[in-house]
């Protein structure tokens, strides 16, 4: 079987542009321009310092390869049993619509690093990222175990 674990439900470039939608128009334009080049398979050499974390030269080959895929199209092609475990209800629904026979579950209060976090506040979320004492969410493990054992 295949398990989609907090996977994107739409292309990565759409997600990046959405995440930066609150930035000034010039930044949004730059991001779209960089994304357009990467989607075309072309690396970008003049990345502004403020966007280096996202688009530094060492990560561009990865982004180029990732941008080739639409998760909805990929998951629709799968023929084996599929389990969709999701944090974002929006992405879960997109993936579920692509493969209605898939088993899917929203994991309440789990963030994208698979830890329990009851807050959507970014500072609270980030505190869980670096805390090695926080375990992986228990519901996640139980759901995966049931899927694998069937």
Question: Model regions: which residues?
Answer:
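Accessory cap/linker subdomain of secreted extracellular hydrolases
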Residues: 1-74
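Alpha/beta-hydrolase-fold catalytic nucleophile elbow
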Residues: 3-6, 85, 108
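Solvent-exposed, polar/charged alpha-helical surfaces in well-ordered, non-transmembrane soluble domains
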Residues: 73-76, 93, 97, 138, ...
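Short beta-strand/loop motif that positions the catalytic acidic residue
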Residues: 78, 84-86
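Residue-level detector of structured alpha->beta connecting loops
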Residues: 79, 99-100
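Conserved alpha/beta-hydrolase "acid-adjacent" motif
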Residues: 87-93, 115
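Acidic beta-to-alpha connecting loop that harbors the catalytic carboxylate
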Residues: 89, 108-111
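Catalytic active-site module of serine/aspartate enzymes centered on a nucleophile-bearing elbow/loop
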Residues: 103, 110-150
């Amino acid at each position: 079987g295949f398990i989609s674990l907090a996977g994107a439900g739409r292309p990565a470039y759409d997600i990046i542009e959405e995440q930066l939608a609150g930035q000034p128009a010039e930044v949004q334009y730059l991001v779209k321009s960089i994304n357009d080049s990467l989607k075309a398979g072309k690396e970008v050499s003049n990345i502004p310092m403020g966007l280096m974390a996202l688009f530094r030269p060492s990560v561009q080959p990865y982004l180029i390869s990732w941008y080739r895929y639409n998760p909805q199209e990929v998951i629709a092609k799968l023929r084996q049993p599929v389990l969709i475990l999701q944090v974002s209800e929006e992405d879960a629904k997109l993936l579920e619509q692509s493969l209605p026979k898939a088993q899917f579950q929203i994991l309440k209060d789990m963030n994208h690093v698979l830890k329990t976090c009851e807050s959507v506040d970014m500072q609270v979320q980030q505190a869980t990222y670096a805390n090695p004492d926080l375990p992986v969410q228990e519901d996640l493990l139980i759901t995966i175990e049931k899927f694998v054992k069937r």
